[in-house]
């Protein structure tokens, strides 16, 4: 089953007009913005990195091929008071040449998740990003060394060859999301990193300052234009050891906007299982243990103060578990700063629209 791409290859514009949307995206409410980045509405809710390398190894056929990965999840627009939208995700794997004439399929996974976060962080430095409001497109410029250095700084070291392979996977894997339950079903199809332009060794020898560039997903550009992103603690995210702990952190950072001692965040096991795609064990007890480990990592990093859980039973059978998460004061302060930034940015953009600044 092939997933088609919506448009032909593009090249980045030579220049774009300065715009308030990109300026706001790169402006953080903090004395030190180096540890901050942005969560992206919808994009970060898509469980596109959920298939582990171990699962991929078990799923490949004798020709090293993988099927299209299919998963359902729910997405609730944080800026709208509406019911959750049921979504169907398809991920077409990338076919990577691992040795001359030999190709192996890969789904995007943990390494690609981390590199995406690094690229978004690099993009937030205006020296390395370009954003067109009218064209709804965003470009990032980078070198392999920039990515490697940032990953090492954050305790997630990868070799140059590993980074190059991840970029190839991101530039080939196709993500399709179908939004269901509507009179007219909407479908979004895109690469994780479009129009990737690479620097070869000969290119580097001729121009050591030459850079790679790629186009970020249209959903990211749309979020920048509409101010539906949120400031969050990028340093904390990158310090977390597992995909599930990072999933919790980003979900809390984007959705838990009323964080406080009197307002715990509640989430069910079934919701975690459906929306993260990261509970891979056949036994529920093993998956519950993974959740406990992930949540305790958030306690260690002052995201959560404490957690409690309540089993929902049908007779002797556990049918679901409700987790009640209490925010740490440090996280509450971060959420308040993110809320203040969002209010300020919306006010600023409304003034731009009225022509008052």
Task: Specify the residue positions occupied by each region the protein language model found.
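Charged, alpha-helix-forming regions
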Residues: 1-357
């Amino acid at each position: 089953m092939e997933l088609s791409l919506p448009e032909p290859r593009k090249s980045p514009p030579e220049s774009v007009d300065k715009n308030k949307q990109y300026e706001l995206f790169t402006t953080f409410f903090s004395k030190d913005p180096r540890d901050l980045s942005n969560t992206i509405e919808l994009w970060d809710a898509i469980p596109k990195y959920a298939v582990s390398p171990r699962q991929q190894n078990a799923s490949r056929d004798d020709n090293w091929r993988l099927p299209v990965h299919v998963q359902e999840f729910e997405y609730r627009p944080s800026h709208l008071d509406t019911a959750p939208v049921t979504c169907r995700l398809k991920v077409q794997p990338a076919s990577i040449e691992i040795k001359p004439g030999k190709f192996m399929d890969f789904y995007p996974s943990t390494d690609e998740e981390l590199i995406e976060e690094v690229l978004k962080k690099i993009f937030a430095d205006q020296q390395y990003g370009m954003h067109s409001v009218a064209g709804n497109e965003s470009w990032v410029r980078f070198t392999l060394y920039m990515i490697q250095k940032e990953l090492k700084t954050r305790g997630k070291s990868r070799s140059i060859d590993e980074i190059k392979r991840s970029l190839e996977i991101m530039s080939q894997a196709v993500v399709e999301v179908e939004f269901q339950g509507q009179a007219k079903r909407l479908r979004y199809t895109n690469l994780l990193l479009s129009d990737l332009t690479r620097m070869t060794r000969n290119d580097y020898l001729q121009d050591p300052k030459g850079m790679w560039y790629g186009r970020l997903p249209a959903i990211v550009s749309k979020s920048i234009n509409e101010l539906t992103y949120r400031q969050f603690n990028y340093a904390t995210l990158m310090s977390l050891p597992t995909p599930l702990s990072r999933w919790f952190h980003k979900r809390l950072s984007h959705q838990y906007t009323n964080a406080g001692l009197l307002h715990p965040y509640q989430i069910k096991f079934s919701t975690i299982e459906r929306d993260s795609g990261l509970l891979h064990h056949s036994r529920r007890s093993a998956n519950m243990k993974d959740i406990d480990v992930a949540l305790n990592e958030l306690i260690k990093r002052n995201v959560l103060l404490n957690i409690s859980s309540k089993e929902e039973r049908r007779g002797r059978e556990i049918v679901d578990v409700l987790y009640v998460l209490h925010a740490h004061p440090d996280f509450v302060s971060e959420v308040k700063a993110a809320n203040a930034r969002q209010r300020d940015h919306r006010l600023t953009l409304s003034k731009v629209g009225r022509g008052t600044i």
